[in-house]
């Protein structure tokens, strides 16, 4: 269920820093 995780991280990125998402999901970029 990688999509679920990505979606959750993406939403979190909006509330948190985008840098966190880049570190958590470097594949997205």
Curated annotation (Swiss-Prot):
Alphabetic keyword roster: Amyloid, Calcium, Lectin, Metal-binding, Secreted
Could you tell me what the cofactor note in this record states?
A: Binds 2 calcium ions per subunit.
- Pentraxin (PTX) domain location: 6-29
Report the subcellular localization: Secreted
Family matches, as InterPro entries: Pentraxin-related
**UniProt GO molecular function:** carbohydrate binding; metal ion binding
Q: Required co-factor? A: Ca(2+)
Please indicate if the UniProt record lists Secreted as a keyword.
yes
**In which family does this protein belong, per the annotation?**
Belongs to the pentraxin family.
User: What does the subunit section of this Swiss-Prot or TrEMBL entry state?
Assistant: Homopentamer. Pentraxin (or pentaxin) have a discoid arrangement of 5 non-covalently bound subunits.
Which named protein is this? Answer: Serum amyloid P-component
The taxonomy runs: Eukaryota, Metazoa, Chordata, Craniata, Vertebrata
